UniProtKB/Swiss-Prot annotation:
Task performed by this protein: CRISPR (clustered regularly interspaced short palindromic repeat) is an adaptive immune system that provides protection against mobile genetic elements (viruses, transposable elements and conjugative plasmids). CRISPR clusters contain sequences complementary to antecedent mobile elements and target invading nucleic acids. CRISPR clusters are transcribed and processed into CRISPR RNA (crRNA). A ssDNA exonuclease with 5' to 3' and perhaps 3' to 5' activity.
Keyword Iron-sulfur annotated: yes
Species for this entry: Thermoproteus tenax (strain ATCC 35583 / DSM 2078 / JCM 9277 / NBRC 100435 / Kra 1)
Entry cofactors: [4Fe-4S] cluster; Mn(2+)
Pfam family, one: Csa1
Domain of life: Archaea
Keyword S-adenosyl-L-methionine: no
Induction: Slightly induced by 20 J/m2 ultraviolet light. Member of the csa1-cas1/2-cas4 operon.
Binding positions for [4Fe-4S] cluster per the UniProt entry: C55, C266, C270, C276
Name of this protein: CRISPR-associated exonuclease Csa1
Quaternary assembly: Can form a Cascis complex with Cas4 and Csa1.
Family: Belongs to the CRISPR-associated protein Csa1 family.
Gene that produces this protein: csa1
Cofactor-binding details, from the entry: Binds 1 [4Fe-4S] cluster per subunit. May not be required for nuclease activity. Mn(2+) required for nuclease activity.
This protein's UniProt keywords: 4Fe-4S, Antiviral defense, Iron, Iron-sulfur, Manganese, Metal-binding
Length: 278
């Protein structure tokens, strides 16, 4: 989705406008053996269940982890999951195209009929962008090999999974990593993205012991045509501290089996809406 040049520009702009990344040693993910990174308990929570702050009171955590309620599928969530799968398929198919010459073909089987048009539009958009960039860097001699040209066109290593246990989490799957930055794609409403990105960064730091100082949020809209907006964040002390605060509050709700009660207003897209309001 994002080319090497785009990501480099995003990170450069973040450094200029937000300043250099300054992270206290005690807030690195690899400091998981001591406070404040060390969790109060090891419950294996999913990062996405709390980091974005979609549930103002955290009652969704109580319903899921204490009462064992299962989330109910909603149309926005199903659409987001389907379009994520299309995006990752396009990235994988692009590499097959580069190394084996296999044609890139939009998803067909298994795609709900009401999402087929959006899925095909997204896939074709990504395919045209990536193959066009790939052919350009080869023709212009910016890259001297297929491997280098593929990196220019698609530098994101997709779906990076790490063990979140050192942070008290379950397995953490970041949408991608590129040029030392963690990348997340969103197709629906999003909030607290810098906090969530900090969480992904710290989980990767805990696993590999390498610093992740920047995060990139890509908001994608698919409605007849594809539009996206990418923003880069410096993952300094502030978002890391907010992430740890949110994690500790989530652990407290689950460990204490405390029902925080429903929020005054809940989005109907919440997968626990019907259970919470019943």
């Amino acid at each position: 989705m994002l080319t090497l040049l785009e990501i480099a520009r995003l990170l450069r702009r973040a450094k200029v406008t937000q300043g250099p990344a300054e992270v206290s040693p005690e807030l690195r993910g690899w400091a998981y053996d001591r406070q404040p990174v060390k969790p109060p308990a090891y419950l294996g929570l999913a990062l996405s269940d709390f980091a974005y702050g979609y549930c103002p009171t955290g009652r969704s955590l109580y319903l899921k982890y204490v009462l064992g309620e299962r989330p109910q599928p909603t149309k926005p969530l199903a659409e987001g999951q389907a379009l994520h799968a299309v995006l990752f398929k396009a990235l994988e198919d692009f590499r097959r195209y580069v190394y084996s010459g296999a044609p890139m073909s939009p998803p067909g089987e298994g795609m709900p009929e009401d999402l087929r048009a959006k899925a095909e539009a997204l896939y074709r958009y990504i395919a045209v962008r990536l193959t066009g960039e790939y052919q350009y860097v080869l023709a212009s001699r910016l890259a001297r090999s297929r491997d280098a040209a593929a990196f220019y066109a698609a530098p994101i290593a997709a779906q990076i999974a790490v063990d979140g246990a050192p942070l008290g989490l379950s397995y953490v799957v970041a949408d991608g990593v590129a040029l030392g930055a963690v990348v997340e794609f969103k197709f629906g409403p999003s909030q607290n993205v810098d906090v969530a990105l900090a969480g992904y960064a710290m989980a990767i730091e805990a696993e590999y012991g390498v610093p992740i100082d920047y995060g990139i949020h890509v908001q994608i809209a698919v409605d007849g045509q594809v539009e996206y907006r990418a923003s880069a964040y410096v993952l300094g002390d502030a978002p890391r501290a907010k992430f740890l605060e949110a994690r500790d509050e989530a652990i407290d709700v689950v460990a204490s089996a405390r029902d925080p009660g429903p929020a005054p207003q809940c989005p109907k897209t919440c997968p626990y809406y019907s259970v919470c309001r019943s």
